[in-house]
């Protein structure tokens, strides 16, 4: 099994839910990315989503857009992100790392070259926002051949056909976008999420992580009551945007530890 599959199997065996925090590689300072990744793991992250900066992040709200702009302005590239993962792996061989981003940087490197470089760096999963599952069979096969889980998005508007298409290509887990719109939006409706997850699981036999709209321990716990994992990004990126550089890792670890405690208080099994 992959590191991601092992992680979710262990969580299920313990009756626990996953915590998947997101930060943008290179923000606020490229020299601190690995330190921040360790802070996430030490705070209780089960999987780390590491954003690959891109100039046109269409699915992201203003907070993550700004973080991408800052990272790009400091020269962060896909190869630099892979190097960050490689350096993270020098100390942490257990926590899965998922790269989340857009197709252009991967296509510029070449899918085969990317698969090999990501494997060698210690990447466990890849979520390419603008790769529709119906057109991603070759890409997903290349990732799986390299031991990397291809991860896909589903949304409240996803049809049964789209869910089935994700089921054909995805592995690791599915990222369910709980809201229409972009990352960082508000008005989370947990009852709607709870109603959608059985439809997803009937066609996609994978854990479901839920993100978008999760801002604090209370919303994280509410989502953990109905999902297999909680994904949180914009709030963490905002924290890093506002923190003094010398305090960023400690503040991030403390915030994530609060989420971990709240999620561990969620006892209801996922649908």
UniProtKB/Swiss-Prot annotation:
Pathway: Amino-acid biosynthesis; L-tryptophan biosynthesis; L-tryptophan from chorismate: step 5/5. The keyword Cytoplasm does not apply. One of its GO terms (molecular function) is tryptophan synthase activity. Its EC number is 4.2.1.20. The active site is at residues 49, 60. It catalyses: (1S,2R)-1-C-(indol-3-yl)glycerol 3-phosphate + L-serine = D-glyceraldehyde 3-phosphate + L-tryptophan + H2O. Transmembrane segments: none annotated. Keywords: Amino-acid biosynthesis, Aromatic amino acid biosynthesis, Lyase, Tryptophan biosynthesis. It comes from the Bacteria. Gene3D superfamilies: Aldolase class I (3.20.20.70). Pfam families: Trp_syntA. One of its GO terms (cellular component) is cytosol. NCBIfam families: trpA (TIGR00262). Belongs to the TrpA family. The alpha subunit is responsible for the aldol cleavage of indoleglycerol phosphate to indole and glyceraldehyde 3-phosphate. Tetramer of two alpha and two beta chains. HAMAP family: Trp_synth_alpha. This is Tryptophan synthase alpha chain. The lineage of its organism: Bacteria, Pseudomonadati, Pseudomonadota, Betaproteobacteria, Burkholderiales.
């Amino acid at each position: 099994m992959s590191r991601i599959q092992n992680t979710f199997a262990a969580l299920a065996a313990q009756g626990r839910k996953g915590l998947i925090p997101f930060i943008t590689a290179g923000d606020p300072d490229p020299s601190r990315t690995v330190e921040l990744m360790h802070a996430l793991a030490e705070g209780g992250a089960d999987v780390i989503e590491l954003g690959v900066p891109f100039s046109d992040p269409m699915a992201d709200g203003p907070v993550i857009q700004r973080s991408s702009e800052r990272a790009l302005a400091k020269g962060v590239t896909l190869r630099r992100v892979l190097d960050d993962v490689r350096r993270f792996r020098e100390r942490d061989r257990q926590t899965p790392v998922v790269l989340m981003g857009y197709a252009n940087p991967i296509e510029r490197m070449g899918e085969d070259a990317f698969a090999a470089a990501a494997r060698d760096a210690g990447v466990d999963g890849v979520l390419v926002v603008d790769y529709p599952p119906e057109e991603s069979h070759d890409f997903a096969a290349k990732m799986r051949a390299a031991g990397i889980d291809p991860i896909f998005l589903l949304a409240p508007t996803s049809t049964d056909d789209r869910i089935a298409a994700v089921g054909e290509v995805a592995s690791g887990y599915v990222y369910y976008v709980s809201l229409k719109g972009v990352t960082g939006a508000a008005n989370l409706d947990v009852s709607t999420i709870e109603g959608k997850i059985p439809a997803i699981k009937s066609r996609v036999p994978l854990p479901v992580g839920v993100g978008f709209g999760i801002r604090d321990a209370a919303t994280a716990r509410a989502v953990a009551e109905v999902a297999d994992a909680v994904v949180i990004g914009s709030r963490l990126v905002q924290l890093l945007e506002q923190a003094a550089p010398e305090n960023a890792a400690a503040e991030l670890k403390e915030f994530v530890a609060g989420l971990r405690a709240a999620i561990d208080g969620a006892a209801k099994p996922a649908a």
